[in-house]
């Protein structure tokens, strides 16, 4: 339903306001527990079980891929009237890491540069997902239209420096003790999303 509404909204000849997005933010919990329950007292739309850090990174990449596909893969302009000069975000998932990620498999941090390298190594055809296209290409190419994680890193650093920010992805981590939102962003022309994607307007961010 969400993907269909995004496509229809982006292709509507009479403007985006006629067609409403039917997208809902999903609450996702990632756990290393063997049982069904994630955090006690909390309700989630889906629970993902992992055994180690490689599985965890792969599942995060799959979530990003599903979000990217759901919102039109950066090819569909679904922004409302009046937002064309701004970044317009759609929140796909609210991701919670169960305490077992730290306690059972000892993961306290996930390096963002390592995550980019996993995107480079993992192919779309090698994951189990009903929505991600079956293609013999890496997630890095799917997201950024490049084959080198170093190229993505360099582009991010350059974009940050142009905005007066010193960036070093070696020191950027996802920490399981925090919650994260997974979003896509429609960006105005000239943004870092366009630089990385060879012309696309969006980006999958966690």
Question: Would you name each region that the model predicts?
Answer:
Residues 1-206:
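Long, compositionally biased, intrinsically disordered regions
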């Amino acid at each position: 339903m969400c993907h269909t509404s995004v496509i229809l909204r982006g292709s509507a000849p009479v403007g985006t306001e006629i067609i409403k997005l039917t997208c809902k933010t999903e609450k996702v919990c990632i756990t290393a527990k063997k049982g069904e329950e994630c955090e006690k007292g909390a309700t989630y739309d889906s629970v993902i079980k992992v055994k180690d850090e490689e599985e965890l990174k792969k599942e995060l990449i799959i979530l990003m891929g599903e979000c990217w596909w759901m919102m039109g893969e950066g090819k569909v302009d679904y922004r409302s009237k009046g937002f064309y000069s701004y970044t317009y975000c759609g929140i796909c998932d609210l991701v919670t890491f169960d305490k077992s990620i730290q306690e059972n498999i000892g993961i306290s941090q996930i390096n963002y540069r390592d995550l980019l390298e996993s995107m480079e190594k993992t192919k779309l055809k090698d994951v189990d997902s009903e929505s991600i296209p079956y293609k013999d290409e890496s997630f890095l190419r799917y997201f950024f239209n490049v084959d080198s994680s170093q190229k993505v890193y360099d582009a991010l650093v350059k974009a940050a420096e142009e905005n007066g920010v010193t960036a070093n992805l070696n020191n950027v981590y996802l920490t399981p003790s925090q919650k994260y939102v997974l979003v896509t962003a429609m960006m105005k022309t000239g943004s870092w999303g366009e630089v990385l994607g060879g012309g696309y307007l969006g980006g999958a961010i966690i």
